[in-house]
From Swiss-Prot:
Entries under InterPro entries matching the protein: NA-bd_OB-fold, Ribosomal_uS17, Ribosomal_uS17_bact/chlr, Ribosomal_uS17_CS
Job description of the protein: One of the primary rRNA binding proteins, it binds specifically to the 5'-end of 16S ribosomal RNA.
Gene this protein is translated from: rpsQ
Annotated disulfide bonds: none
Any one GO cellular component localisation term in the record: cytosolic small ribosomal subunit
Keywords linked to the UniProt accession: Ribonucleoprotein, Ribosomal protein, RNA-binding, rRNA-binding
Name recorded for this polypeptide: Small ribosomal subunit protein uS17
Highest taxon of source: Bacteria
Pfam families assigned: Ribosomal_S17
Matching PROSITE patterns: RIBOSOMAL_S17
Parts forming coiled coils: none
GO biological process: translation
Similarity field: Belongs to the universal ribosomal protein uS17 family.
Example of a GO MF term: rRNA binding
Length: 93
């Protein structure tokens, strides 16, 4: 009696990757990053800057205020934290 093991190759969805600037690093293992989105006004056509702040997980505490960082979407780590730090692209001067 040979049983075939059903291997489910469940693919995870593509995760969003965003770039932004660190505006706060006062929490332990958490940074606040400001993400900028440029959208076109639906009626007038002008390009508008829209910003949003997200909390991201910084395991080693390497990012500081003013650093340009790359974030990746992840599972919910807390009530407000759904992003994690991938790398620091540019340190603040």
């Amino acid at each position: 009696m040979s049983e075939e093991k059903a291997v489910s190759t469940e693919e995870r969805g593509s995760r969003k990757v965003r770039t932004g600037y660190v505006v706060s690093d006062k929490m332990e293992k958490t940074i606040v990053v400001e993400l900028e989105d440029r959208v076109k006004h639906p009626l007038y056509g002008k390009i508008i800057r829209r910003t949003s702040k997200v909390k991201a997980h910084d395991e080693n505490g390497v990012a500081g205020i003013g650093d340009r960082v790359q974030l990746m979407e992840t599972r919910p780590l807390s009530a407000t934290k759904h992003w994690r730090l991938v790398e620091v692209l540019e340190k603040a001067k």
